[in-house]
């Protein structure tokens, strides 16, 4: 059986010398797939994503990307390997224009990135319209599109999003999810942490429900939405 494109396998660890937050947690994503991590507050969702990105030290387990063990690489080196990461907050330069923000995303590129910029504008048409506007003047949903677009400028092999719909209205959330689906259709696998579990699972090829840093449930998005225990405990019935 072929290994998933990305796998954080049996990850155990926490921040610095503190207690473990993750306990044998496994997260995997295939090419072109949307995988979401959901669960209650304090479940370790964002911690699991940060572990995959190298922002905390694992005591046990490993992270492999496209068959390579990247467990000992820094976040910067993981970006060079093909990881794109969009944090939940402070993810744009508010005083720069939209286009300047996107061009900042190409900082590791040594080639002509104009074609990639056009692809980002095709995925996020509102950014083309507002490309000369200061990013700080945009709405919350538009700022998130800038942040995702900037990550795409690195031509990542994998895109990770930490609560991309935090603080936006339901209508904007639906639009962001539509854009995320469009990104996945280009072949880029997406790993996403979401508080809006029901909506996230509805677009997910694969879902992971974490509880206290452990895998509680996993399966396709549809399977988890139809699981009575998941619905009762995490989706409000």
PLM regions and their residue ranges:
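Glycine-rich phosphate-binding loops of nucleotide-dependent enzymes
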Residues: 2-237
């Amino acid at each position: 059986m072929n290994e998933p494109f990305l796998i954080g396998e049996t990850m155990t660890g926490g921040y610095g010398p503190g207690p473990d937050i993750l306990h044998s947690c496994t997260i995997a994503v295939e090419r072109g797939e949307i995988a979401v991590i959901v669960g209650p507050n304090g479940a370790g969702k964002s911690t699991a994503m940060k572990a995959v990105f190298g922002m905390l030290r694992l005591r046990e387990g490993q992270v492999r990307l496209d068959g390579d063990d990247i467990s000992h690489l820094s976040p910067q080196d993981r970006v060079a390997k093909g990881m794109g990461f969009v944090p939940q907050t402070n993810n744009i330069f508010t005083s720069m224009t939209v286009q300047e923000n996107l061009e900042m995303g190409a900082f590791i590129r040594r080639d002509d990135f104009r074609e990639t910029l056009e692809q980002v504008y095709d995925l996020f048409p509102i950014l083309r319209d507002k490309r000369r506007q200061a990013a700080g003047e945009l709405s919350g949903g538009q700022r998130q599109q800038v942040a995702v677009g900037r990550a795409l400028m690195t031509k990542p092999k994998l895109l990770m999003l930490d609560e991309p719909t935090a603080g936006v209205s339901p209508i904007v959330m639906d639009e962001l999810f539509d854009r995320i689906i469009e990104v996945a259709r280009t072949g880029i696998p997406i790993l996403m942490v979401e508080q809006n579990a029901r909506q996230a699972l509805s677009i997910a090829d694969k879902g992971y429900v974490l509880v206290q840093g452990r895998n509680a449930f996993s399966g396709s998005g549809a399977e988890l939405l139809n699981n009575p225990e998941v619905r009762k405990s995490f989706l409000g019935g």
